[in-house]
Amino acid sequence: MISLKRIFCTCCLLLSVWAVFAQGPSKWKALEKPLNFYLANDLGRNGYYDQKPIAELMGQMAENVDIEAVVAAGDVHHFEGVRSVNDPLWMTNYELVYSHPELMIPWYPILGNHEYRGNTQAVLDYSQVSARWEMPARYYTKVLENDDITVRLVMIDTAPLLDKYRKDTEKYPDACKQDMDKQLAWLDSVLTSAKEDWVLVVGHHPIYADTDKNDSERLDMEKRVDSILRKHNNVNMYLCGHIHNFQHIRKAGSKIYGA
C-alpha cells in the first residue's frame, strides 16, 4: 500500500492556503510528491474575499511544485450560477482571476448548489470554450498517473441527490430533472471496477460535517452516497466543499477519510 504521504492534495481554503504562504517559496519545493493537484471549491467571488490573492498564491506555488491539475469541487460561480457560456461571470469569477500561467492546466470541475441556481448545461458547455475546463458530463471519472502512481477521481453531482434541491424547483430548476438512481448505479459500478492505487470521490456537499447548514443535506448524503462508498474497500477519501471551511473527518467504523 502506498503511503498517504506520497499524494499531496493542496486544498484551496483560506486558512490552509495562508499557512502555506507563510512557509514561503523556499519550503514549497519540499512539499512536492510524485503526483500533486489542487482541490479548490466555493471560489466564485468576482475576485473579492481574498479570491484574487489566493489565486495568485496558487500560481506562485505551482512555479515551485509540479501541479498536475485543479479539481474544482463546485460553486465556482456564486451566487446565481451562470446564464450562458458568454456570461461575464466566466471572466470575473474564473478567467481573469486564475490567470497565472502555471494555472493554465486541466481543471476538473463539478456542479455546486449555486451553479444549480443558473444554467447548469452552460457549465458543461464551457468545456467547448476553454481548453483547460474539462467537464465531459455532470458526473464522470478521471485517472491521474505519474511516476507509477495512479489516482482515480470519481466526480459526482450531489445537488440532485438531495431532496432539499429536488423539491425547490423554482430556485434549483435543473436538480429534479436529473436521474438520481442512474447516477448512484454509475457510482457503484465505477467503484466496483476501480483498480488504481488511490480512489478519491469528489462531490460538492459533505457527508459528515460540523456545520449549521441544513441537516437534511448530510442525512441524504449519508443514506445515498456513504452507503455506496462503504461497500467498497478501495475508496480512500471523499473530498468536498460547500461549508466554506476546512475539516478532516473519519467517521467511526469507516476507513474513508473526508475533507
Label the predicted regions.
Residues 37-39, 70-72, 109, 201, ...:
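Residue-level marker for buried hydrophobic side chains located in beta-strands
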Residues 19-88, 181, 210:
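N-terminal active-site segment of His-dependent metallophosphoesterases
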Residues 1-23:
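Bacterial Sec-dependent N-terminal signal peptides
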Residues 205-213:
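Active-site clefts of carbohydrate-active enzymes
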Residues 40-45, 74-76, 113-114, 158-159, ...:
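Active-site metal-binding loops of divalent metal-dependent hydrolases
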Residues 31, 78-199, 213-237, 243-259:
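Extended active-site neighborhood of metal-dependent phosphoesterases/phosphodiesterases
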